[in-house]
From Swiss-Prot:
Swiss-Prot/TrEMBL catalytic activity: heme b + (2E,6E)-farnesyl diphosphate + H2O = Fe(II)-heme o + diphosphate
UniProt feature, compositional bias: Low complexity: 155-164
Protein name: Protoheme IX farnesyltransferase
The keyword Cell membrane is assigned to this record: yes
Protein EC: 2.5.1.141
Biological or metabolic pathway of the protein: Porphyrin-containing compound metabolism; heme O biosynthesis; heme O from protoheme: step 1/1
Primary localization class, coarse: membrane
Pfam families linked to this entry: UbiA
Organism: Haloquadratum walsbyi (strain DSM 16790 / HBSQ001)
Key words of the record: Cell membrane, Heme biosynthesis, Membrane, Transferase, Transmembrane, Transmembrane helix
Alphabetical GO biological process terms: heme O biosynthetic process
Region (Disordered): 155-186
Length: 479
């Protein structure tokens, strides 16, 4: 009984360590984003002294000056948290690689604070500001890596090894996919509605809202440069985007119809059930492609080229080459989701710029953190279909760890985007709050390891990106 109690107490203490480490990491991230915001609002110039304002000890004379002071106070608190986290890790005999990584972050922290003090006293200096930004993001990334490693050790299955080949064959021993009755209703009106719903399903409408938000964010970012955003350009770009997504989804249905019949969650798709004839679906996809390219061409030729590339990449490169052949299909395939950011930017500016590339990078890095949750939830289904998704090939423990890693990289890229595009407080709050929520559910996934937990993390990833994209639109158009 005493041994069981000691084990339970140790598990609780380790959970607290993970909570403290995650809180410290997000605290560092908060400092980075608030620091970017203070630079944007010239708050640092309103309090150009250290540790407070004026002669070094005077109170601020303006609201933005108080923002700078608040940033420094929070920096002290987070620094204390970093030291406490390291101390708790030592007390709990956390594994060596985690302790070393946390120690590196704790060692870099006062150096980072000193650079911040120099920036505050000497005023804005590009070199020092870049060093300060990179330093803060590096500390955050270091702590996030330590968190992922510790969660892997404490919650992972030590017996789990890579037993599945890099390209698994469809597993015939798994339960068969459920039967689905494709019969159309006898009533002509109901039959027409059922057919219409089937064609709508081919376009994968659930993907459209988020990818349209990505394109919208790209357009509004482009409008802050030399670009001009008009209602006509916005409507044509979003219309072309919706149709290109629909075309890509339709071709995906066509090419995966045989595999869809083997998988539980896709066995009721229109082509898998012969609800829509294959050649009709192909013609439908071609029609959507043509109209999409026409709309993009009306905006500009580069947008049309990128739209065509997006359709080909998702339909051919991802569906035929990446998804069935490599465990890195999700990572490389993230380029398909990133292209709408460039299309939105190009639609307004006419060329590819740093802002569009920065937003595309955020989407690219977010994709594995987002989709690996779905891969965990449907691991058995993907194995049945013969797809080498990470949980199938490398195991669930490795996949959960990668969710944390890719989330951390996403937040780093989001911080870089805030700096490049001078985004404000709304963006900072959205990225911090929803990033913390995503991290919370990703950590919870490590402990619960259920399908429901994977879906919670999946939905949290959607909420994060949606909130960040809306914040970009708000910051660029309203503020």
């Amino acid at each position: 009984m005493a041994e069981q109690t000691a084990t339970t107490t140790s598990a609780i203490d380790i959970r607290r360590f993970h909570g403290l480490l995650a809180g410290t990491a997000m605290g560092v991230y908060l400092l980075v984003l608030v620091g970017v915001t203070t630079a944007v609002t010239d708050a640092a110039a309103a309090c150009a002294a250290w540790p407070i304002c004026g002669n070094g000890w005077a109170t601020p004379g303006s609201a933005i000056g108080w923002l700078a002071v608040g940033h420094r106070v929070v920096a002290v608190i987070i620094g204390i948290c970093a030291v406490v986290t390291l101390g708790v890790g030592i007390r709990e005999h956390i594994e060596r690689r985690v302790l070393i990584t946390v120690a590196v972050g704790s060692f870099l922290y006062p150096i980072q604070a000193a650079v911040g003090a120099v920036v505050a006293v000497q005023g804005p200096d590009l070199t020092l500001s870049v060093i300060h930004l990179i330093g803060g993001l590096s500390i955050f990334l270091t702590l996030a890596i330590a968190l992922a490693w510790s969660l892997e050790t404490e919650t992972g299955d030590p017996t789990e090894t890579q037993t599945t080949p890099s390209k698994p064959e469809p597993d015939q021993d798994l339960p068969p996919a459920s039967e689905y009755d494709p019969d159309l209703p006898a009533d002509p009106r109901d039959r027409l509605l059922a057919t219409l719903r089937a064609y709508i399903r081919l376009t994968k409408p659930r993907l459209m809202w988020l990818l349209c938000l990505v394109a919208s964010a790209g357009m509004t970012l482009g409008a802050t440069t030399t670009g001009q955003l008009t209602p006509g350009i916005a409507l044509a770009t979003l219309g072309g985007g919706v149709l290109s997504i629909g075309a890509s989804g339709t071709f995906n249905h066509v090419l995966e119809r045989d595999v869809d019949r083997r998988m539980q969650r896709t066995s009721d798709r229109p082509l898998a059930t012969d609800l829509v004839p294959v050649w009709n679906a192909i013609a439908f996809g071609i029609l959507l492609t043509v109209i999409s390219i026409v709309l993009f061409s009306w905006v500009n030729m580069l947008a049309a080229i990128l739209g065509g590339v997006a359709i080909v990449f998702y339909s051919v490169v991802y569906t035929l080459l990446l998804k069935p052949n490599t465990v890195q299909n999700t990572v490389i395939g993230g380029a398909a989701g990133a292209l709408p950011a460039l299309i939105g930017w190009v639609a307004v500016t006419g060329d590819i710029g740093f802002g569009g590339l920065a937003l595309a990078t955020v989407i690219f890095l977010w994709t594995p953190a987002h989709f690996y949750n779905l891969a965990l939830a449907y691991k058995e289904d993907y194995e049945r279909g013969g797809f080498p998704m990470m949980p199938v090939v490398r195991g669930e423990t490795e996949t959960r760890k990668h969710v944390i890693w890719w989330l951390a990289l996403t937040l780093v890229a989001a911080g870089g985007l805030a700096t490049i595009e001078a985004l404000g407080i709304v963006y900072a709050v959205a990225s911090i709050v929803f990033g913390a929520v995503f991290l919370y559910f990703a950590i919870k996934l490590h402990y619960e390891q259920t399908k429901a937990a994977a879906f919670h993390s999946f939905h949290a990833s959607n909420a994060y990106l949606g909130a960040v994209l809306i914040a970009i639109v708000f910051d660029t158009l309203v503020i």
